[in-house]
Swiss-Prot record:
Family in the record: Belongs to the universal ribosomal protein uS8 family.
Protein name per UniProt: Small ribosomal subunit protein uS8
Organism: Synechococcus sp. (strain JA-2-3B'a(2-13)) (Cyanobacteria bacterium Yellowstone B-Prime)
Top-rank taxon: Bacteria
Quaternary structure and interacting proteins, as annotated: Part of the 30S ribosomal subunit. Contacts proteins S5 and S12.
GO BP terms, alphabetized: translation
Length: 136
């Protein structure tokens, strides 16, 4: 796996490419951040499961992608992934300014002082943070 400075953008691109190609699963390099994002995607029902394989530098997170419909009518559950905050331009929001994605259908993944969580959880806890990405 290639080395990248933005592991989140790399993860989102791999998921986007895998869903467009209708792959069953996708592997991304394992970091604390990719594990946390995988956990949130699973909790919110965007992926059916995630697991970690390998050890050390070879460790990777494998996400099992979800689709609705069968055959030619097969549509991915994840319609879009958008990186918001990036290494060159960080985006921070307080709990009142957190984005609502498609009126609550999608989620924003936020990095807070209490860990990685969805915009709904952060709003409920009354905390803001770095808006990592949008998933819908």
């Amino acid at each position: 796996m290639a080395h990248t400075n933005d592991t989140i953008a790399d993860m989102l691109t791999r998921i986007r490419n895998a869903t467009m190609a209708r792959h069953e699963s996708v592997a991304v390099p394992a970091t604390r951040m990719t594990r946390s994002i995988a956990r949130v995607l699973h909790e919110e029902g965007f992926v059916s499961e995630w697991k970690e394989e390998g050890e050390g530098i070879q460790a990777r997170v494998v996400l099992r992608l979800k689709y609705k419909g069968k055959g030619r009518n097969c549509r991915p559950i994840i319609n879009g992934l958008k990186r918001v905050s990036r290494p060159g331009l960080r985006v921070y929001r307080n709990h009142k300014e957190l984005p609502r994605v498609l009126g609550g259908i999608g989620i924003a993944i936020i990095s807070t002082s209490n860990g990685i969580m969805t915009d709904r959880e952060a709003r409920k806890q009354g905390i803001g943070g770095e808006v990592l990405c949008l998933v819908y």
